[in-house]
Regions:
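Short, surface-exposed polybasic-aromatic patches that bind anionic ligands, especially phosphate groups
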Residues: 1-441
Length: 441
């Protein structure tokens, strides 16, 4: 007669076959049908337990120390519960700061710690210090990109244009010569440099002058005026040379104007000038043998207007009054490249009357900023933080170091006038330095 133990085994075997037949349609499957489900459940629970334990350990290790802020040196303290920024100079008394920028300037910015509100509850409090209006967040230096830097003039309505500035703009390779009309004055923009010319001058030919803004003009390097030759000896017989003083002459193949070299007859001989210098005099150049010019040169070998190319210049035939015109600076050139028709976003605040003293919009890379300095400034001299469409002056290397920008940041050098047109983030006379930050607010 079967024993109870054998009956139980037989019952279990029969039950397993019934379940296998129902689930797997195979009563002879030796593997229990729910085994994989059980193993999967067990492994999932085990992995979840490991993850929970790992996060718990991470939270324990990264939990702000209750007394990490109490050091015998200046420390910036960030309250992780409230977001309030404090600083301490002696590890005992803590002072609220108007912003992280001010706290870094006061302490030197070397040490920044986090603490909970409870950890700071027993600390002695001082008055609030800092620069009201200074940035409440500083861009990471890895996001600080100045070039390519682009200033664009955009059509708004008839005879109304906006001027915008973008850092970290797309690069350009082409360069276009244009005419620019601002405040009833006409300029040639050649090689990225603006030259004043007489109104009604033939230099532009049939090109349409862009009726631009003063802000766009001031963003360009200013070259010397291109004007007709004027001298008390004009028309007199020259001491050297066969032409009257002031005569424009050329050498080269008479059938190939591209080969012509231009000169002006001075009292003591011939002096080289550019194509545009020749054209502004509104004369028909006289052909002279190159050998004769070479043997009768003036002591003033070259009187061309500085910054102008010596050869012919073709101005764009595009109607610049109806499209964007941009000047793009790069790190390796003091003069920008001029492009026409770029797709550029306009200002978010579309005012009926665009700003004159500032750009209508200033944009940096998303989440980033830029550091700029004026042309001619020493390496350790004043720089400007461009952040959230405004500029903040940083007067010296010490202040820049406190803000974390002493090294690892490419500082863009730009024209002083360009820099002056970026809206100020602080009142006149206030800069990001320890002197201004270390005052009760």
């Amino acid at each position: 007669m079967a024993q109870r133990k054998e009956l139980l085994k037989a019952h279990a075997f029969t039950q397993q076959r019934l379940v296998a037949a129902l689930v797997d349609r195979d009563p002879d499957n030796p593997t229990p049908p729910l085994r994989r489900l059980g193993i999967g459940t067990f492994v999932s629970i085990l992995v979840a337990a490991v993850l929970v334990g790992g996060f718990a350990l991470f939270g324990y290790l990264t939990k702000p120390s209750t007394n990490a802020w109490s050091q015998d040196k200046p420390v910036v303290i960030v309250d992780t519960d409230s977001g309030v920024v404090f600083f301490t100079l002696d590890g005992k008394t803590i002072f609220p700061a108007t912003n992280i920028t001010s706290a870094r300037l006061i302490t030197g910015g070397d040490t920044i710690v986090k603490a909970t509100t409870a950890a700071l509850a027993s600390a002695e409090r001082g008055p609030r210090y800092g620069i009201v209006g200074a940035p409440s967040q500083l861009p990471d230096k890895s996001t600080m990109t100045a070039f390519p830097l682009r200033v664009c003039s955009l059509p708004a309505t008839k005879n109304v244009r906006y001027t915008v500035l973008d850092t970290h703009a797309p690069g350009v390779t082409s360069d276009t010569a244009i005419g620019l009309e601002v405040n009833n004055h006409t300029y040639l923009v050649v090689g990225g440099m603006a030259h004043l010319i007489p109104n009604g001058s033939p230099l532009l030919g049939n090109a349409t002058s862009l009726k631009g803004t003063e802000a766009f003009l001031r963003a360009l390097p200013q070259g010397q005026e291109v004007k007709p030759f004027s001298d008390a000896t004009t028309g007199n017989k020259a001491l050297r040379g066969q032409n009257p003083v002031g005569t424009i002459v050329y050498t080269g193949d008479q059938t190939d104007k591209a080969s012509w070299n231009y000169y002006i007859q001075l009292i003591d001989g011939y002096s080289a000038i550019s194509y545009l210098d020749a054209m502004v005099n509104n004369q028909t150049p006289t052909a002279v043998q190159a050998s004769y010019v070479a043997s009768n040169r003036s002591e003033t070998q070259n009187t061309a207007t500085p910054g102008l190319p010596m050869g012919p210049v073709t101005f764009t035939s595009t109607d610049t009054t109806k499209t964007s015109v941009c000047a793009t600076y790069t790190a390796d050139s003091a003069n920008p490249k001029i492009t026409i028709g770029d797709t550029v976003a306009g200002p978010t605040d579309t005012k009926a009357t665009p700003a004159v003293a500032t750009y209508d919009r200033v944009t940096t890379a998303p989440g980033g900023g830029a550091l700029l300095r004026s042309l001619g400034t020493d390496a350790d001299g004043a720089t400007f933080l461009i952040w959230q469409g405004q500029k903040y002056g940083i007067p010296d290397l010490e202040s820049r170091t406190s803000l974390g920008y002493a090294s690892g940041v490419n500082i863009g050098t730009v024209q002083p006038a360009l820099l002056s047109l970026i809206p100020d983030g602080l009142p006149a006379g206030i800069a990001l330095d320890r002197t201004h930050a270390n005052h009760p607010a």
